[in-house]
A protein has these predicted regions:
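Flexible "arm" and connector segments at domain edges
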Residues: 1-59, 65-187, 191-251
Length: 251
C-alpha cells in the first residue's frame, strides 16, 4: 500500500477510536465542529500568506482531521462515509474535465467551465458562490463566474473607467446628502468596481489587501516598540513622526 494511503487509513482508524473512547470527541457534532473548521482554514491561509511550509504541513493535517471527523459522524448517522465523499469528488473531477476524460469530440471542443457547472443542475451561474463567504472574496468569485460566460470588461481601461465613474458617484453622494445608507451603497459599488479592475489586471484583491494589512501591522507594531511611552498617550504629530520612521525602516 502507498504511504499516503497508509497514513490516511491510520487517521480514519484513530478518529473512529476517539469517537468511541474520548469524552470530548464522542459528543462532537457537525454544528460544534463548524466554527473550529473555519478557524483551521484561516490558520492554513496564514501559513500560505506567511510562506511557512512547515506550519502549512501541520495545518493541512488539522484540516484532514476535520474532514475525516465529519465523515465519521456522517457514517454513524447512516448518511455517507469517507469513501462516498472521496468517490463523489473523483466523479466530479472527471465530469468537469471532458478535455481529458471525455470522448474525442469533447476533447476537441470542450464546454466552458461554467457550462459544465450548469450541466450539473445549477439554476444560476452564481449558485456555487457561498453566501457566507467574506464580502471581498464573494465579490471576486461572482465576477470570475460571470466572466466565465463572457460577462466581463473587454480591457482594463474600461474597468478603470468604471472605477472612476463609481468614485465620482461617491463624491456626488457625499456632497448632496447625509443619508448614510446611500453613501454606504455607493462605497460598495466603488469597492466592487475596484475588485473588478484588479481582477482584469491579474491582481488578486484579497491577496493585495492582505499584504497591505501585514505591512500596516508590522509598521504599527514597530511604532509601539519605538514609542517612549504608551502609544495612546502620544499626540498626532508624534504618531506621524513614529509612523514615517517605521515606514522608512520597514520597506
Amino acid at each position: 500500500m502507498k504511504p499516503e494511503l497508509q497514513a490516511f487509513e491510520r487517521l480514519t482508524d484513530i478518529i473512529e477510536e476517539l469517537r468511541q473512547k474520548c469524552p470530548w470527541d464522542k459528543v462532537q457534532t457537525f454544528e460544534s465542529l463548524r466554527y473550529l473548521t473555519i478557524e483551521e482554514v484561516y490558520e492554513l491561509s496564514d501559513t500560505i500568506v506567511e510562506d511557512q511550509p512547515e506550519e502549512m504541513k501541520k495545518e493541512l493535517g488539522d484540516l484532514f482531521m476535520h474532514l475525516v471527523f465529519y465523515s465519521s459522524i456522517a457514517k454513524e448517522k447512516g448518511l455517507f462515509d469517507i469513501s462516498d465523499a472521496i468517490n463523489g469528488v473523483c466523479e466530479k473531477l472527471i465530469f468537469r474535465h471532458p478535455h481529458i476524460y471525455g470522448s474525442g469530440e469533447e476533447r476537441q471542443n470542450p464546454p466552458s467551465w461554467e457550462e459544465i457547472k450548469m450541466a450539473e443542475g445549477r439554476k444560476s451561474v452564481l449558485d456555487g458562490v457561498p453566501n457566507s463567504l467574506p464580502a471581498m472574496i464573494k465579490a471576486l468569485r461572482m465576477q470570475e463566474k460571470a466572466a466565465g460566460i463572457g460577462f466581463n470588461w473587454k480591457n482594463s481601461s474600461l474597468a478603470h473607467d468604471k472605477v472612476m465613474e463609481e468614485y465620482r458617484e461617491v463624491q456626488e453622494e457625499l456632497h448632496k446628502t447625509d443619508n448614510q445608507d446611500r453613501i454606504e451603497e455607493e462605497f460598495g459599488d466603488l469597492f466592487f468596481a475596484l475588485i473588478g479592475w484588479a481582477r482584469i489586471l491579474g491582481v488578486n484583491p484579497e491577496n493585495a489587501l492582505e499584504k497591505t494589512n501585514r505591512k500596516f501591522r508590522q509598521r504599527f507594531q514597530k511604532m509601539e516598540r519605538d514609542a517612549d511611552r504608551t502609544i495612546s498617550e502620544l499626540g498626532t504629530d508624534e504618531l506621524l513622526e513614529l509612523w514615517n520612521k517605521a515606514k522608512n525602516e520597514t520597506k
